A protein has these predicted regions:
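Charged interaction scaffolds used for protein-protein
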Residues: 1-6, 10, 18-21, 25-39, ...
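Short, hydrophobic/amphipathic alpha-helical patches that form generic packing surfaces
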Residues: 40-51
Length: 105
């Protein structure tokens, strides 16, 4: 999901380097250490939305708590599934590239 809808408005929501920095500032931990705890996932989604909005010059005036009040568990599950699917697709693409890279050496 490259976008998230809140109160009928669409906002960009994607992983950026800023999202990782925001997560570290919010939690004191690295985003790469996220398990499947709902609060961590929700915080990371918030960081992704806030950073993507900054990058795209889209106004995003929600605090983490305001954001959490407007997000449903289904939205969290959908976002998590989309991120997992994208990660699996990236791995598959890298595996396809690896054999051809070896042949050229």
């Amino acid at each position: 999901m490259n976008k998230i809808t809140i109160n009928g408005n669409e906002y960009p929501c994607r992983q950026t380097m800023g999202a990782f920095l925001r997560f570290k500032r919010e939690t004191g931990r690295e985003a790469t250490d996220i398990k499947q705890e709902l609060t961590d996932v929700l915080t990371f989604i918030y960081c992704c939305a806030a950073s993507a909005c900054d990058a795209d010059h889209v106004e995003f005036n929600y605090t983490l708590i305001q954001f959490a009040d407007l997000i449903t568990p289904d939205m969290v599950n959908e976002w998590t599934a989309q991120m997992q699917a994208e990660a699996e697709a990236n791995v598959a693409n890298e595996q396809k590239k690896s054999p051809s890279a070896l042949k050229n050496n």
